[in-house]
Amino acid sequence: MLFHVTAQHSWETCRGRLRAEGAPNALPPSEVSRWVEGNDDVKVLVAGGYQSAHRYYAFVEAEEYGSVVRLFNPEMWVGDVEILPMNDMVARRKSEGDWGK
């Protein structure tokens, strides 16, 4: 299944800002945005960020919704995460024989 993920945090919870200010609970750079690499259950197809808005976007592929939730769980502690199942409209159009018509 394909999923579209949007992760949004605020400047107050921004891990980059916390690290720059020397917060004792700040994650090391290697741990920030680890989700970009995916894992055994979730393949990240595209990942992008709009840093000035503290917002990230991703298209991922996984067998189960729960696998995507687990991958993005660390982001859920600092802001809102929306995970939407998606249909592959390109594959659908091709499989229906309508591609190029």
What are the residue ranges of the model-derived segments?
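An amphipathic, aromatic/His-enriched active-site/gating alpha helix that lines ligand/cofactor pockets
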Residues: 61-95
